[in-house]
Amino acid sequence: MNVASIMDDLKRRMDGAIVAFKHELGGLRTGRASASLLEPLTVESYGSVVHINQVANISVPEPRMLFVSVWDKTMVGAVERAIRDSGLGLNPITDGTNLRIPLPELNEERRKELVKIAHHYAEQARVATRHVRRDGMDNLKKLEKDGEIGQDEAHSLSEKVQKLTDETIADIDKILAVKESEIMHV
């Protein structure tokens, strides 16, 4: 393993932590309708568990309304149950093979709870980033021990790894701040 591949791997894995964090945040309600709100939900379909978007189309016809068009009418009940039991506080209205889901206003208590969840997701992303940093540092120490790089180069590269870590954590904090303001905005 050479230095360039180590640095590329670190960058890719840290970017992956940010992508995963953004995906987690996408599932949090902000008061505006978003199809990503229902994407993490699963439903049992013919003996296997699949995501809702694999058995239905999810669209946003209005800012405070989700519309779910289920492809198979035998799945409507299961999709409705999955949405009701999701803990998102949503009550779908069934109309044939379609579900209309009005999004109620978030109260202050629920907003604070969502912010707390967002902070938890951010901390998970930071921890993942630090784990990647530790792996990178271990690889650099191994290269130095094996004599593939010198002590000065190892020190310089560890500073680059730390800088990359700091930038990634700063990006996570920026994304969190934006999401927090979205959640708290009435």
Swiss-Prot record:
GO terms for molecular function: ribosomal large subunit binding. InterPro entries: Ribosome_recyc_fac, Ribosome_recyc_fac_dom, RRF_sf. One of its GO terms (biological process) is cytoplasmic translational termination. Keywords: Cytoplasm, Protein biosynthesis. Coiled coil: none annotated. It comes from the Bacteria. It holds the Pfam family RRF. One of its GO terms (cellular component) is cytosol. It is found in: Cytoplasm. Responsible for the release of ribosomes from messenger RNA at the termination of protein biosynthesis. May increase the efficiency of translation by recycling ribosomes from one round of translation to another. Belongs to the RRF family. NCBIfam families: frr (TIGR00496). This is Ribosome-recycling factor. It comes from Bartonella tribocorum (strain CIP 105476 / IBS 506).
